[in-house]
């Protein structure tokens, strides 16, 4: 069994340091955290880069064809492509099961529809010989999702604002960064 990111214990310890210092912090969320908290969390992540692998899929939703922009198509397809790539590199032959944990689907009235679409997409894209489960947990409940949030924020800042300050700190863990933008996006996404 392969457990996730060992830095989770250090994040838990830091969270308790903040609580003991009188800071009422429930969870880490990069965009909302104060600068000093954000910098410290990036320090903790950077100290454990050898223990993690980051794969990114960068896409502009507005550039894909209209039928793929619907949430029930876009997110399942993107997650499927990303997982297919990651699993082709990471999956060991002795793995009995793949457990995928994503952040909760924020669209309350569409949550069930999107979750079902994600399962259908993964069934088509993942190895038929492996059993898998996909769970949608609140990022508040899982330090691994909070680390993913920090990494995604750093990638977003790099692409959206040209600010690589935090990305530069985590890039050694970057195994792949796929860019599905504009015309290339349409060609790749419209293939079945």
Regions found by a protein language model. Give the residues of each.
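Phosphate-ester processing/binding pockets and catalytic centers
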Residues: 1-192
